[in-house]
Curated annotation (Swiss-Prot):
Consequence of substituting R39S: In strain: ATCC VR-358 / Fuller / CIP 107027
SMART domains referenced in this protein's UniProt entry, alphabetically: AAA
Protein localization: Cell inner membrane
Gene3D superfamilies membership: 3.30.450.90, P-loop containing nucleotide triphosphate hydrolases
Protein name, UniProt field: Type IV secretion system protein VirB11
Protein's gene: virB11
Organism: Bartonella quintana (strain Toulouse)
Amino acid sequence: MNQNLHKLSNETVAIVLTKLEPISAFLKDKSLFEIVINRPYQVMTEGIEGWKTIEAPALSFDELMGIAKVVASYSKQKISDKNPILSATLPGNERIQIVIPPAVEKDTISMTIRKPSSRNFSLEELANKGLFSVCEQVSFTPLNDYQSRFSELKHIEHSLATAYSNKDFVSFLNQAVKCQKNILIAGKTGSGKTTLSKALIAKIPDNERIITIEDTPELVVPQPNYVSMIYSKDGQGLASVGPKELLESALRMRPDRILLQELRDGTAFYYIRNINSGHPGSITTVHASTALAAFEQMTLLVKESEGGGDLERDDIRGLLISMIDIIVQCKRVEGKFKVTEIYYDPFKQRNIFGGN
């Protein structure tokens, strides 16, 4: 039985790879970040040198629809007029987003393929590549007041604040992960959020039990004691479970940390529940334009969620400021991943907690 299932799985992968043959060269090209198809007979790629357009005579509308259906079958999902949007992971771990009519213009199909990094970089390696070369400190409390107010902080916060004030961001983030600070990585799509989150996750001590919650497998957890939980995006997939159900399950699985892959829609509310349940040390991502704007984005996401709709906006924002210790803003600058801002303000949190 197991051999039959293994054979069936291999056959399914072979069918997908055969269908993807017209773009296989782009999938194998390690210099590319993104592969997009906006319409039949054309492929666009993004690499270090920017966007390029390539004619693709083999990619007719029917051929693209064939790819969409095979990918849907491979990922145990459906794509049709009634379900025109598909999020999936290809056999090579590339993330693919497919949109077909009527959700896009007639006779067109949109495919966006995000290629995973060919290797995982350590925080130190990223720093040596200039990750923090343009980084600015962001806080509600004036930075000039930090040194004079160190005596207000506990020992670990004193050490963190010292590294932060000295712009020793590698030491700062290393300490932050080890002492289970809640870290939010913000930026737009393709800004390097996942690359940085992998580097930070690698800093979690090996003796901690980690539960990850994702809609597509992307996070790399090198620690031996971890469980990767997957929820069905938009109710697709074999199991109709969402982040709420997985979080409730994770809380019963003896976790030291629960890591949500990305905060959007209802997941932002469950992020608050996770932190508030006594499981700090979260490392997660959100789409936002600046570090402080991440608070506003999170407030909107929580407010729009089913669980947070009745909460007042100011209460949500205050709760987020009290719970999120660090926000790291990522951006791609001239084709290179950069951290442009780091928010850290223990004094603001201390005021919210009443000086405790």
